[in-house]
């Protein structure tokens, strides 16, 4: 675990220019927080229950899919052709229920953004979107992002997520980022 955190820290110090696909959770979380700040957020809350990261902010509500589009485009070049095809397919499936097409493509990684109390956008990469996950969307006020780290369950650890939070807080000193665990 310490080596994993060290690798994340080293990659982060390089401005995220060179980073492995397994480190996507840190990149995506950084991007989400950056987008929250651009929308005027001054307080960001991150919680972790052992498997899922939840991010709340006090920014203005999302009005379109810009945040998801930027995240997709930013990281598409780092993925294999198969994963790029998956993302392009998912681009077309975001607002098209039922979610069977998404479920068929996914196994391990997901990023869900809510807009108010309705499902807003989904990015999945080897992850499964279940009714339980969708049920989490829209809880509380403001915007919420649910992200499941793309790591094995045995490697899911609050210490690692806490390290990520410290790095991200250093990157964004102008906002208050709080971290709590529900493990």
Name what the model sees in each region.
Residues 1-34, 38-42, 65-72, 158, ...:
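Bergerat-fold GHKL ATPase/HATPase_c domain
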Residues 27-62, 130:
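ATP-lid-like helix-loop hinge signature
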């Amino acid at each position: 675990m310490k080596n994993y955190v060290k690798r994340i820290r080293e990659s982060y110090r390089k401005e995220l220019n060179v980073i492995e696909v397994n480190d996507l959770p840190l990149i995506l979380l950084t991007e989400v927080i950056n987008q929250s700040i651009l929308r005027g957020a001054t307080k960001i809350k991150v919680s972790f229950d052992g498997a899922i990261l939840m991010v709340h902010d006090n920014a203005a509500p999302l009005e379109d899919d810009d945040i998801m589009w930027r995240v997709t485009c930013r990281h598409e070049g780092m993925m294999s052709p198969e994963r790029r095809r998956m993302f392009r397919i998912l681009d077309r499936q975001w607002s098209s229920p039922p979610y069977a097409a998404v479920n068929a493509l996914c196994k391990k990684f997901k990023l869900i953004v809510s807009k108010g109390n309705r499902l807003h956008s989904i990015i999945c990469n080897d992850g499964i979107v279940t009714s339980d996950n969708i049920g989490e969307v829209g809880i509380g006020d403001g915007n919420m992002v649910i992200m499941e780290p793309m790591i094995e369950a045995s490697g899911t650890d609050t210490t690692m997520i806490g390290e990520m939070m410290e790095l991200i807080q250093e990157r964004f000193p102008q906002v208050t980022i709080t971290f709590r665990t529900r493990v």
